[in-house]
């Protein structure tokens, strides 16, 4: 342990010495005048140039003498040439001793990795075939005071990558790719829904009654109104109010907050897509979801086969559709239908499976507990799990043929819940009764049970058309499409404990 501590201290001393040297260089720049100029305007991006002139030979580029202005961070400095990186990629810039003044040549020698420079010149190609800018002018725009991570080892400490995402993005192309994909996914989802006549809306983040999901909220206090408020756990009840109001197809992509555990699959602040469409049911949402997921896989990967870890998920095949009840029996052949239909036997099975049984649960909730413990993790390929018991679906419409269950599904891929959807409950009296049942659950010790929302009941009393709604976890979806093992890998700034 002492050896590790000594090594860490040595590294810190070395870094401090490098920072001190860079600060001296910055002081010298300040003495010259403006050390942070802001009058340069580039006309090209590094990777765009690489693509645009990929087929041009050395001779063709020399004859064309194409002028360009680029800027970026120095990632390699060999003296005679540097490699700079901008938001699109990298390009070499050549330090031509014949065209650059002595003062500039001397300055270039003092520049460090991480410094941000501008470069003007003409495009050329090296004998090895690399495209580069033969510089006629180069300037330091921003002096970097901290050294970049060692080029051979990079930024390999996972926690440091999360805490200092700005450094992670500088040095790890894989990280940059992940977040480009995330942006691409969200943009395509938005386009997909707008093309189908959905209206994008925004609903409150601060709510007086946290509703729309079974979760523990973050609580805050509104000073001016002197009242307790909650960060939203879901936008559902507000979106359905909009359907009541006549916006028959709406969606929102935004943050939700749940005051719960942190894991590779859970972050207290996460991004959710929720959409609602009138005159549709949960089966319509299944079809829409399959179509969306296939488009996203094709867009990101060029294929409907999605590699994840040592598995491949097949989005091109029809997603399996199976009820909660049937899935328990399919994946646990030692259990019988009679086991799941008897409350005492179901309670014993749930306890033995490791579920946190409080003792007051009804049969439906016990069945879901059994499903969560014994089935969820086995659902590797895409599965729509349907017919959730009404006890755990307080906002979903009861099934016409079996009122003990609801017209609801959850989508599982790789053993993880990715989406939750149902035909919406639009019976105001039934909704009021279910809210009261949720209040009783909360009084019995269930922190995640819902509050009674009188205004939402009132909205339903005006009449909501038959509607289907769905929520899709954007973070987990991006995890799948980027083969990322942790939700923190796909959130730019995940929540972390403060450093000691």
Swiss-Prot record:
Top-level taxon of the source organism: Bacteria
InterPro entries xrefs: Aa-tRNA-synt_II (IPR004364), aa-tRNA-synth_II (IPR006195), aa-tRNA-synth_II/BPL/LPL (IPR045864), Lys-tRNA-ligase_II (IPR002313), Lys-tRNA-ligase_II_N (IPR044136), Lys-tRNA-synth_II_C (IPR018149), NA-bd_OB-fold (IPR012340), NA-bd_OB_tRNA (IPR004365)
Main subcellular localisation: cytoplasm
Gene3D superfamilies per the UniProt record, alphabetical: Bira Bifunctional Protein, Domain 2, Nucleic acid-binding proteins
Pfam families: tRNA-synt_2, tRNA_anti-codon
Any one GO BP annotation for this protein: lysyl-tRNA aminoacylation
EC numbers on record: 6.1.1.6
Homology family: Belongs to the class-II aminoacyl-tRNA synthetase family.
Listed name of the protein: Lysine--tRNA ligase
Cofactor: how bound: Binds 3 Mg(2+) ions per subunit.
Gene that encodes it: lysS
Reaction catalysed by this enzyme: tRNA(Lys) + L-lysine + ATP = L-lysyl-tRNA(Lys) + AMP + diphosphate
Transmembrane segments: none
Record keywords: Aminoacyl-tRNA synthetase, ATP-binding, Cytoplasm, Ligase, Magnesium, Metal-binding, Nucleotide-binding, Protein biosynthesis
Binding-site residues for Mg(2+) 2, renumbered to this chain: 417
Enzyme class, UniProt record, top EC level: ligase
Cofactor field: Mg(2+)
Compartments in which it is found: Cytoplasm
Organism lineage string: Bacteria, Pseudomonadati, Pseudomonadota, Gammaproteobacteria, Pseudomonadales
HAMAP family, sorted: Lys_tRNA_synth_class2 (MF_00252)
GO terms for cellular component: cytosol
């Amino acid at each position: 342990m002492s050896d590790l501590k000594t090594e860490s201290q040595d590294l810190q001393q070395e870094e401090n010495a490098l920072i001190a040297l860079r600060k001296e260089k910055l002081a010298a720049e300040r003495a010259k005048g403006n050390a942070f100029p802001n009058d340069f305007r580039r006309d090209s991006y590094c990777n765009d140039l690489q693509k645009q002139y990929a087929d041009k030979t050395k001779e063709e580029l020399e004859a064309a003498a194409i002028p360009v202005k680029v800027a970026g961070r120095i990632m390699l400095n060999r003296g005679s040439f540097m490699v700079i990186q901008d938001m699109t990629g990298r390009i070499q810039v050549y330090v031509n001793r014949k065209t650059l003044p002595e003062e500039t040549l001397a300055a270039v020698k003092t520049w460090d990795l991480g410094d941000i420079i501008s470069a003007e010149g003409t495009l050329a190609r090296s004998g090895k075939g690399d495209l580069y800018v033969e510089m006629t002018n180069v300037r330091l725009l921003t002096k970097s005071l901290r050294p970049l991570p060692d080029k051979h080892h990079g930024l390999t400490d996972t926690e440091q990558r999360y805490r200092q995402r700005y450094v992670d993005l500088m040095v790890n192309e894989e990280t940059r790719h992940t977040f480009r994909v995330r942006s691409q996914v969200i943009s395509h989802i938005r386009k997909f829904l707008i093309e189908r006549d959905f209206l994008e809306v925004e609903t409150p983040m601060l709510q007086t009654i946290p509703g729309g999901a079974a979760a523990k909220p973050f609580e805050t206090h509104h000073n001016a109104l002197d009242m307790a408020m909650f960060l939203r756990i879901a936008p559902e009840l507000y979106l359905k109010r909009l359907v009541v109001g006549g916006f028959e197809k709406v969606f929102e992509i935004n943050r939700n907050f749940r005051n719960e555990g942190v894991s590779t699959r859970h972050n207290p602040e996460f991004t959710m897509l929720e959409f609602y469409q009138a005159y549709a049911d949960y089966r319509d949402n299944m079809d829409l979801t399959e179509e969306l997921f296939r488009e996203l896989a094709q867009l990101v990967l060029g294929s409907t086969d999605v590699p994840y870890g040592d598995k491949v998920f097949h989005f091109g095949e029809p997603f399996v559709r199976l009820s909660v009840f049937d899935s328990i029996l399919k994946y646990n052949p030692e259990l019988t239908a009679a086991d799941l239909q008897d409350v005492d036997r179901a309670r014993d099975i749930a306890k033995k499976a490791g579920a946190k049984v409080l003792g007051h649960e009804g049969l439906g909730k016990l069945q879901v507990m059994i499903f969560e413990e014994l089935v969820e993790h086995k659902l590797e390929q895409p599965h729509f799990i349907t017919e959730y018991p009404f006890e755990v679906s307080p906002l979903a419409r009861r099934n016409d043929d079996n009122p003990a269950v609801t017209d609801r599904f959850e989508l599982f891929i790789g053993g993880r819940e990715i989406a939750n959807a149902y035909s919406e409950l639009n019976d105001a009296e039934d909704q009021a009764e279910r809210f009261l049942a949720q209040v009783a659950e909360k009084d019995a010790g269930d922190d995640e049970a819902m509050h009674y929302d009188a205004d939402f009941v009132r909205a339903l009393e005006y009449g909501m058309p038959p509607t289907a709604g769905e929520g899709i976890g954007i973070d987990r979806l991006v995890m799948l499409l980027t083969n990322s093992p942790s939700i923190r890998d796909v959130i730019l700034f995940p929540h972390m404990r403060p450093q000691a």
